[in-house]
């Protein structure tokens, strides 16, 4: 039976991991075993944080809306409840951008909701 040499396959596998480890510090970019561990950890963190990013941005938007709503004499929960009751359909991202970039428009929304 012919001898099977796995040089190319093993080298490709290692180079794939080492390429993913570019930019890491110390032996984490050069040594295969530590690079492999760091890459696996990085991929796990990236997977987790892609989901977490959505939560973090929603929290940020809510904080911004609440701060601007309090400046205009109401709070977040009353504002959102009033918007639902008066059938104003603006999502939290757009509302936060309005509060940040166009306070006059946000103030009009708050006044129309509170009436």
UniProtKB/Swiss-Prot annotation:
Molecular functions (GO terms): rRNA binding; structural constituent of ribosome
Record-annotated membrane-spanning stretches: none
Keywords of the record, alphabetical order, are: Ribonucleoprotein, Ribosomal protein, RNA-binding, rRNA-binding
Q: Which residues form a coiled coil?
A: none
Which HAMAP family does the record match to this protein? Ribosomal_bL20
Q: What does this protein do?
A: Binds directly to 23S ribosomal RNA and is necessary for the in vitro assembly process of the 50S ribosomal subunit. It is not involved in the protein synthesizing functions of that subunit.
What family does the Swiss-Prot or TrEMBL record give for this protein? Belongs to the bacterial ribosomal protein bL20 family.
Which NCBIfam families does its entry note? rplT_bact (TIGR01032)
**Name of protein:** Large ribosomal subunit protein bL20
């Amino acid at each position: 039976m012919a001898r099977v040499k796995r040089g190319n396959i093993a080298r490709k596998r290692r180079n794939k991991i080492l390429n993913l480890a570019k930019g890491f510090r110390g032996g984490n970019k050069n040594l295969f075993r530590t690079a492999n561990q760091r890459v696996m950890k990085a991929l796990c963190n990236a997977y987790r944080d892609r989901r977490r990013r959505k939560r973090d941005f929603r929290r940020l938007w809510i904080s911004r809306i609440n701060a601007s709503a309090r400046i205009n004499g109401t709070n977040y929960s009353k504002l959102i409840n009033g918007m639902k009751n008066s059938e104003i359909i603006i999502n939290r991202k757009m509302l936060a951008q309005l509060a940040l970039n166009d306070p006059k428009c946000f103030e009009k929304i708050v006044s129309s909701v509170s009436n």
